[in-house]
Every structure is written in structure tokens, then in C-alpha cells.
Design a protein with these regions (language model features):
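Nucleotide/pyrophosphate-binding catalytic subdomain
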Residues: 1-234
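Short, intrinsically disordered, charge-balanced linker/junction segments flanking boundaries
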Residues: 236-238
């Protein structure tokens, strides 16, 4: 991320994982934290995942109801509904706290995450993403309006919905943070910081007080669920 520029307000990108949005109480906690920071003058962009285990439930329902014959393109449209619901709830909750926001849906003309057509594991086309972010998302951030963007979801140049595969919301967050020149990227999960192992499997994993990209890649390769290696392709090198 870029170094803090004293001539402008601090700018952050925050991504909320599904477990942190699992019910109305957790959503309210997340929204209140964002609203509090926004009232300090911080410029914020928010990326949200689907609530709780919504994606798994949609996947199971679609596959079982179709006897496993659902096409990948159709499945992506179904799975995207989780995030498309989350952005609407999050934006409405911000509005209820007096915070101006605007959600970005993948069917909007100014949707910023453009991908190839590898359904279920699509790859963002970075130059197209950055052009859209600079044109449509950045002006909102600079005005103090909070964009709420669906993580995990993309759209092809011919306007078909895609999903980005495992770690897709993190991929969205890294792309937004880099293109917006964010001072900070915050990935909010249900773990207490970045752990050396999955705390749901290992009873006493170590909490890592500081971390570099090489270590993140190692954790990703080991199967640690904090972040997926694909998302790290899009991390700012700074």
C-alpha cells in the first residue's frame, strides 16, 4: 500500500469475511466500526463476503437440486447471490447510521472487477479493473462516500457473472487496495489475527505479530485458511 499522504485523509480498504457477517449482530458490529472510522474522516472502501455459510448452502442446493448437472456459468450466477445480498444489507445498515454509501452489484454498468470467462475460478483482467476503479470507485472514496463491493464476484467483458474461486474476496480486496492507493488493507476474519495454523484444527496456534509476503505464501501453501495463494498475486509489492 502507499505511504500515508499528509495532504489527504487516511484511506483504507476493509474486507469482511463471511463468518464476521454471519448474523445481524455481527453485521451491526462491522457496520458500527466502519461508521465510527468514517466519522473521523477516514476514506473507506468495504468488500463483503456472503453471510456465514451462505455460499456453501447455495452450492449444495444448486448441485443437489440439479443432480450435479448445473453448468459452471449458471452456478456462478447462483453463488454470487450471497455477496449480492450482503452488499445491500451492509449499505442499508450504513445508511441507518447516517453514513453515505453506495453498493456495487456485478450487473451495474460501472462494476469494477472484470475477469476472463473461466467460470468458478475466474482471473481478474487487471488493467480493466484498475480503469474501472479509477473512474467509478475512486471519486466516491475521495468524496467520503463508502463503496460497498461484493467480494468473490466478477463479470466478463460480455457481462456474464463469474466467481473468483477460493480466496476470491481477498483477491477483490487486494485489487481495490492497490488501485485506490490505500494506506492500509484490513482483512477481518473470525480468527484473532493471523495464526500459524487453523485455530479450528490446532488447539493452540501461534499468533503472528508481524508478517511478510513470503510467510503469507507459505501459510497459503500449507492450507491455512486465512488467505489463499491466488489472492497474493494481486498484492501491492510495496
Amino acid at each position: 500500500m502507499k505511504q500515508h499522504d499528509e495532504e489527504r485523509h487516511k484511506r483504507i480498504v476493509v474486507k469482511y469475511g463471511g463468518a464476521t457477517l454471519a448474523d445481524h449482530e455481527r453485521i451491526l458490529k462491522a457496520v458500527t466500526a466502519v461508521a465510527k472510522e468514517a466519522k473521523k474522516g477516514t476514506q473507506i472502501a468495504v468488500i463483503v463476503s456472503a453471510m456465514g455459510k451462505t455460499t456453501d448452502q447455495l452450492l449444495s442446493a444448486a448441485k443437489n437440486a440439479s443432480n450435479g448437472k448445473v453448468e459452471k456459468g449458471e452456478l456462478d450466477e447462483i453463488l454470487a447471490m450471497g455477496e449480492r445480498t450482503s452488499i445491500r444489507i451492509f449499505a442499508a445498515a450504513l445508511k441507518a447510521q447516517g453514513i453515505e454509501s453506495r453498493y456495487f452489484d456485478p450487473l451495474d454498468p460501472d462494476w469494477p472487477i472484470i475477469t476472463d470467462n473461466v467460470f468458478s475460478d475466474a482471473n481478474p483482467i487487471l488493467d480493466k479493473c484498475e480503469e474501472k476503479i479509477h473512474r467509478y470507485v475512486l471519486p466516491l472514496v475521495e468524496k467520503g462516500v463508502i463503496p460497498v463491493i461484493a467480494g468473490f464476484v466478477g463479470r466478463t467483458p460480455d457481462e456474464r457473472i463469474t466467481t473468483l474461486g477460493r480466496g476470491g474476496s481477498d483477491t477483490t480486496a487486494f485489487i481495490l487496495a492497490k488501485a485506490l492507493g490505500a494506506d492500509e488493507l484490513i482483512l477481518v476474519t473470525d480468527a484473532e489475527g493471523i495464526m500459524s495454523a487453523d485455530p479450528k484444527i490446532i488447539s493452540k496456534p501461534n499468533r503472528l505479530p508481524d508478517i511478510d509476503v513470503d510467510t503469507l505464501v507459505g501459510l497459503a501453501d500449507s492450507g491455512t485458511k486465512f488467505i489463499h495463494r491466488k489472492a497474493l498475486r494481486y498484492k501491492d509489492s510495496s
